[in-house]
Amino acid sequence: MAIETLTEGGFNALPGKTLGNQFNYFSGTDSDRAADLQKMLDNGNVKAIFCARGGYGMGRIIDQINFKRFRKHPKWIIGFSDITVLQTHLLSRYKIASLHAPMAAAFNDGESGNEYICSLHNALLGRKANYTAAGDDYNRSGKASGMLAGGNLSLLAHLIGTKSDIKTKDKILFIEDVGEYIYNVDRMMYQLKRSGKLKDLAGLIVGRFTEPKDTVIPFGQDTEEVIRDIVKEYNYPVCFNFPVSHDKENYALKIGVHYKLAVSETMTHLKELSEKKS
């Protein structure tokens, strides 16, 4: 469905060799998947790499990839969830932007014309993002501008101490996750805090934490309360329940690009800025 929709939208689609394959939990062996990604990164005719889905597996192959040619001729890497590994690696090591956005699987629900997939289409056409979201009782009001960084909370926590570790100073950080126990969200947020990832932010965007789980003995807080309390000592604006998630409500966000964030109790406004000159 994604290939059909993209073709109808004027894009030419080139399926990867491992698309639709299966090797245990993965779409191929590590060497096959790495070779497939490498080929797409190096192909000068490919202008964007659209990941089919997330799940797990990028961390197994990231160190096998040679980015030498890609760094000279970068292209959009589109995806989220497990793709956070690749996107964070590209920004932290090479200052290359990427698109945190719906993946191919999102086209299969019969809603390929929804505003979130349209936001991806707009990004690919070079249109600047300008999003307004509903307010939230937990919002901490304020304004900020800075480079956008972030992705899936689990992956961001797991990348700490690796070559792909996220750099957050003066950035607007966004986080989201799915199917996590509340105590684990607490643990991962403290991992970010203790490693210095939360103290020097320009702002924080808390996306959706889809299908949260609680333990038999209740944790005593929901995920929003956990995050609110962990960052309460800092002064930057924080918004909650922003439409970035594992659900269909998932706006395209350009990691590595500058945005302006305005947060109030009644709404959140996120606007992409013109590129800064180096």
Where are these regions (language model features)?
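Conserved anion/nucleotide-ligand pocket segment
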Residues: 95-161
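Buried hydrophobic positions in well-ordered alpha/beta secondary-structure cores of metabolic enzymes
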Residues: 49, 82, 156, 204, ...
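N-terminal glycine-rich "phosphate-gripper" loop used for MgATP/nucleotide binding
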Residues: 51-59
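ATP/nucleoside-binding phosphotransfer catalytic cores, i.e., glycine-rich phosphate-binding loops
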Residues: 208-278
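Short, acidic/small-residue loops that bind anionic groups at enzyme active sites
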Residues: 65-89, 97-103, 234-237
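Short internal beta-strands
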Residues: 14-17, 79, 201-208, 239
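Internal helical hairpin/lid segments
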Residues: 167-223
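ATP/NTP phosphate-donor binding region
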Residues: 1-45
